[in-house]
Amino acid sequence: MPWPWRRKSRRTLARIAIEGPIAGGTRVRVLKAIEQVQERECPALLLRIDSPGGTVGDSQEIHAALLRLREKGCRVVASFGNISASGGVYVGVAAEKIVANPGTITGSIGVILRGNDLSRLLKRIGIRFETVKSGLYKDILSPDRALSEAERQLLQELIDSSYGQFVAAVAAGRGLEEAVVRGFADGRVFSGAQALPLGLVDVLGDEESARRLAAELAGLDPEKTRAVTFGKPPRKLLGLLPGATLLQQLSQSLSLELAWNGQPLWLHRP
C-alpha cells in the first residue's frame, strides 16, 4: 500500500549510488541506505549505477531489497553511468525505469567463474600440496591440478543455474520473454544506444534526466524537488594521491583476482 503524502520527506527525492564492483561492503552500505529511504518514506529513489557487476549473492540481495521498496510505494528509477554491466544490470532491472547515457557500457548478461591451474609452476619450484578431503569434489578448483571432466561438468551446471536466475530476473524486470533475453544474454556488451531497442533501457539521458523522471513518476515537481544522497560511498585516502585512478584500478583488479577466484560472478571482465 502506498505511503501517505504527509511528511516533508515525501517531497524529497532519495539518491543511492552504487560505484565499483558489487561485493559485501557495497551490499551492506546499499541495504542500509534503502532501509533509511523506506523509514523516511521518500516517494522516489534515483539509483545511480556505475559498476561492472560483482558477486551473485550480493547483487541478488540488493535487487530483492529494491523490489520490496517498490512494493511500499516508492518509485525507483535507475541511472546507468559509464558502465552498468552484468551484476549492475541485475540490480538495475529491479527499477521501474532505466535511463542510460547513449555511450554507457551495459549488457554482459552472464556468469563467469575462474580458477588458476598452477600445477606446472608449483612443480617447477618444488612445491607439492597434500590434500585430505571428505568428498570427491571438496578440492574442486584447487590450484595444484587441472580440472577433471566431471568437475568441469559440475561447475558448468552451477553456472547454468546462476545464468537461468539472471535471465529470469531480466525478463521479469524488463517485461520481456526469457527466450528474447537469451537471444542477447551471451556475455556481449552494448552501448546505451544499442540497449534501447533491445528493451534493456527505457530512455537515453543523463543522471539529471533520470532525476526528473523519478520526480514525475512520484507526482513531484522536478523543478522544486531536491535529491538527497543516502549511504554515500566512503572516500579512500588512496584517492587523494597523484595518479590515484591508476593505482585504484590496479589495486581493485588484484583484489578481485584474489578474493573472487573460484566464485561464480555476474561481472564484466574485459
PLM regions and their residue ranges:
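N-terminal organellar transit peptides
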Residues: M1-G87, V91-N101, I112-P270
